[in-house]
């Protein structure tokens, strides 16, 4: 094992050994560095790395370690209102509305994973509605349609997100809360509120590596300010245009499944409204409520590139004729 282990290597070693001293010996680092690294990894991914036995390291744990421990504990159990970050150079992959369904792996999802490997993004953002929640919707079941169990949906969401995690490498993993995602906690909080804060009562528990919140701001208060949020600022046929116009910054949203980029320019420069479409198939079983009517939707996702702190025009990967296309080539 190299002296400078990656996060994945550290997690694998800790999971196997579960003893700080043995982990430190295998990695060739001090015991204090091992514990500080553990807390840093827990805070970064919102996970808990358990310790075997009853060893107590509080006597020597650094102040930094204590702060990281507290941060990990908080992040593992809560959503953030705003997620703020900066990016000077690199790629951000943004997809939304996967509505992952048991037994279905879409062309768009496979393309998302392939481009995550090819482009080595700095960030991967799932912009809401990874979960569908068909059986726990406030809307009535349509006739006798077959709907998957919640546990099967959750398992599928975990499988698909794990595929993205493996493909994304060292990229930061972020997801925003969509209205379908909220169905999970809404259903539980309204019916079994006494179980609040117990393990398994939030989607955070099932996707621990993903930082989660309502909105993401990149390069806030700069000319390349980019906001990513599930819902558009304004709906309708001109939603992406109105969203960047009213937000005053480049604005990426999901929810409407259209997949389009709308530029807008004024005295402050050029900015963009982006609808990230859907990772699902537009006529998939998740959308039976459309009653087989035509939908102005498209399967695909967005790719945003920053160079020298400047945001370039967002690009789209679109599924057409059964294949995913990006920059004129099949993915």
Residue ranges of model-derived segments:
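Polar, enzyme-active/binding microenvironments
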Residues: 86-91, 118, 315-331
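Active-site-proximal loop/helix segment associated with metal-binding centers of metalloenzymes
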Residues: 192-222, 256, 274-283
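Conserved beta-sheet core of the metallophosphoesterase superfamily
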Residues: 224-317
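Short, amphipathic alpha-helical "recognition" segments used to contact nucleic acids or chromatin
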Residues: 2-19
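Short Lys/Arg-enriched helix C-cap and helix-to-coil transition segments
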Residues: 43-74
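Core catalytic region of metal-dependent phosphoesterases/phosphodiesterases
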Residues: 80, 95, 100-207
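Mobile, glycine- and charge-enriched loop segments
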Residues: 66-106, 221
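Short, basic interhelical loop/turn and adjoining N-cap
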Residues: 21, 25-42
């Amino acid at each position: 094992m190299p002296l400078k282990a990656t996060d994945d290597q550290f997690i694998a070693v800790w999971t196997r050994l579960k003893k700080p001293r043995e982990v430190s010996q295998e990695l060739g680092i001090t015991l204090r560095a091992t514990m500080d690294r553990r807390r840093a990894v827990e805070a970064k991914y919102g996970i808990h790395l358990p310790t075997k036995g009853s060893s107590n390291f509080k006597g020597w744990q650094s102040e930094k370690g204590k702060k990281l421990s507290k941060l990990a504990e908080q992040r593992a159990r809560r959503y953030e209102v705003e997620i703020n970050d900066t990016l000077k150079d690199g790629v951000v992959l943004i997809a939304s509305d996967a509505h992952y369904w048991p037994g279905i792996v879409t062309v768009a999802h496979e393309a998302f994973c392939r481009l995550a490997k090819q482009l080595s993004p700095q960030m991967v953002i799932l912009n809401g509605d990874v979960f569908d929640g068909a059986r726990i919707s406030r809307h009535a079941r349509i006739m006798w349609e077959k709907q998957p169990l919640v546990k099967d949906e959750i398992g599928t969401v975990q499988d698909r997100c794990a595929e993205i995690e493996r493909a994304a490498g060292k990229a930061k993993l972020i997801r925003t809360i969509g209205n379908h995602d909220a169905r999970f906690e809404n259903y539980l909080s309204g019916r079994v509120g006494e179980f609040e804060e117990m393990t398994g009562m939030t989607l955070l528990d099932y996707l621990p590596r993903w930082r989660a919140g309502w909105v993401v701001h990149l390069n806030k208060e700069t000319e390349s300010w980019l906001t990513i949020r599930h819902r558009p600022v304004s709906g309708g046929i001109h939603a992406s245009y109105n969203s960047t116009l009213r937000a005053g910054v480049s604005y990426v949203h999901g929810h409407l499944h259209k997949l389009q980029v709308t530029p807008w320019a004024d005295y402050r420069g050029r900015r963009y409204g982006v609808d990230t479409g859907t990772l699902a198939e537009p006529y998939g079983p998740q959308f039976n409520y459309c009653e087989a009517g035509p939908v102005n939707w498209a399967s695909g996702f967005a790719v945003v590139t920053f160079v020298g702190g400047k945001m370039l025009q967002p690009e789209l990967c679109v599924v057409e004729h059964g294949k995913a296309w990006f920059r004129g080539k099949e993915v």
